[in-house]
Amino acid sequence: MIFAVVDILEISIQLLCILLFGTTVINCVSKGRHKDVNAIVRETESKKIVPWSDAKVQIKKFLGDGASGTAYLVVWEDKEVVMKVTGIHPQSISVLHDELLITQKIGKLSKSCHNFLPYHGSIVISDLPAKMMRNSECVNHLAIFMGYGGTVLADWRTSDYRRCITIMAQLVLAMRIANDKMKFVHGDIYMMNILIAPTTKRWIEYNIDGKTITIQTFGIIPQLIDFSKSWCGADPERHDISRLHTVAKRVGHSLNGSKRDKKKVRQAVKMVGAAKNWKNLCLYRQLFKQVIVHDH
């Protein structure tokens, strides 16, 4: 009887999602019914829990702790990658399951959009070394392997105002693509969840609505990371746009440049916060005019 009531509740919520947003949502209540670690294990490539001794992970460097896990630079399957490790406890199974699914989807986008890192695989690990554990009560840990990015935006500085603008322009276009393809909402865009990677590419291309938009990189590519608060399906784009506007203002404040250059950054991003959606923001010429190569 109880399960029947829960099923009716879930169906009602999914119907509400469809009425409000036109689709269901990955993070809806149905995901909360994952009862054990096997819900996550089934989504990994190995399909089984792997002892640490068999994981064959070579730790090279500790990168940092975040709210949802710990990151290391490692060698795994003959590749130098970033390993994010998160303890699995009953209350986190649903969240980690969804994060893994979204990370896999976003990883595929990296082939056509440089602002997302490639996904290399995942395993559920048992017997994690004690020195790597944040919660001793977690028997198993989820390890997600991603491409190695750059410097956290919060620690990054520049004296070239054009770099500040290209960061925002690239992120807007990347989010437009992700939103178009999978109705992606990051949910936690802020300075610590954006990496700045150096590049030798002078420009990069984005394919949107059958058009190719070419943007100057000025030697950098911003990359979005951490999908622990992300979801797909519903489409409240204003959530991410508002957060990106906050990031834009902070990047402008941190510019090691003249007052004139800081004003140029402010003018380029001032309307970001007022945009209704990513499509609307992509039409904002003030943001793109100093970094766009061509639009055809």
Swiss-Prot record:
The chain crosses the membrane at residues 1-21. GO terms for cellular component: cytoplasm; membrane; nucleus. Keywords: Membrane, Transmembrane, Transmembrane helix. One of its GO terms (biological process) is mitotic cell cycle. It is found in: Membrane. PANTHER family: INTERLEUKIN-1 RECEPTOR-ASSOCIATED KINASE (PTHR24419), SERINE_THREONINE-PROTEIN KINASE HASPIN (PTHR24419:SF18). Gene3D superfamilies: Transferase(Phosphotransferase) domain 1. This is Uncharacterized protein ZK177.2. It comes from Caenorhabditis elegans. Its main location: membrane. One of its GO terms (molecular function) is histone H3T3 kinase activity. It comes from the Eukaryota. It is a single-pass membrane protein. PROSITE patterns: PROTEIN_KINASE_DOM (PS50011).
